[in-house]
A protein has these predicted regions:
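Short, conserved "switch-loop" micro-motifs in signal-transduction and mechanochemical regulators
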Residues: 94-96
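Non-catalytic signal-transmission and effector/linker regions of two-component phosphorelay proteins
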Residues: 1-11, 17-18, 24, 82-83, ...
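Helix N-cap/capping motif at the beta->alpha junctions
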Residues: 24, 38-47, 68-71
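Two-component/phosphorelay signaling modules centered on CheY-like receiver
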Residues: 17-37, 108
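Conserved sequence signature across two-component system core domains
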Residues: 13-14, 39, 57
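Receiver (REC) domain active-site loop signature in two-component systems and cognate sites
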Residues: 63-66
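A Lys-centered signature of the CheY-like receiver
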Residues: 115-116
């Protein structure tokens, strides 16, 4: 049976520092007891996930170094190789979701899509429902 992720850990991944700060403030205050980590790109997200096994990732799609799709695929590979449960991934973008996001959500109902700008209440409700 696959080993579960750390249910009390959340990873926010976005290359826009202001969004990361805002999301961290909102979610830290709304989800007491949750460890909220951050990453600025997909490469940092993969490294943070390998170290901390976050149960939920809130991830932008368009980032430098490694984009959301590449990070998602790498995390999926890591989970398969290590027999870990795949974390819930909440994709977050200001653009129309690409087909691969729709396919990922169809394959795993724990994954979700949020369109930027997103209200605080929707953000909190969506993340809380995945933790």
């Amino acid at each position: 049976m696959p080993e579960p992720c750390a249910r009390d850990k959340l990873l926010i991944v976005d290359d826009e520092a202001a969004i990361v700060r805002l999301f961290k403030i909102i979610l830290s205050s709304s989800l007491p007891g949750t460890v909220v980590d951050t990453a600025q790109n997909g490469k940092e997200a993969v490294e943070a996930f390998e170290r901390n096994r976050h149960a939920t990732l809130l991830m932008d799609l368009h980032m430098p170094v490694m984009d959301g799709r590449q990070a998602f695929q790498k995390i999926k590979e890591i989970c398969k190789e290590n027999d870990w449960v795949m974390p819930s991934v909440i994709f977050c973008t200001g653009y129309a979701p690409p087909e691969w996001v729709n396919a990922a959500m169809a394959a795993n109902p724990a994954h979700r899509m949020l369109n930027k700008p997103v209200s605080s209440s929707t953000l909190i409700e969506t993340v809380r429902g995945r933790m």
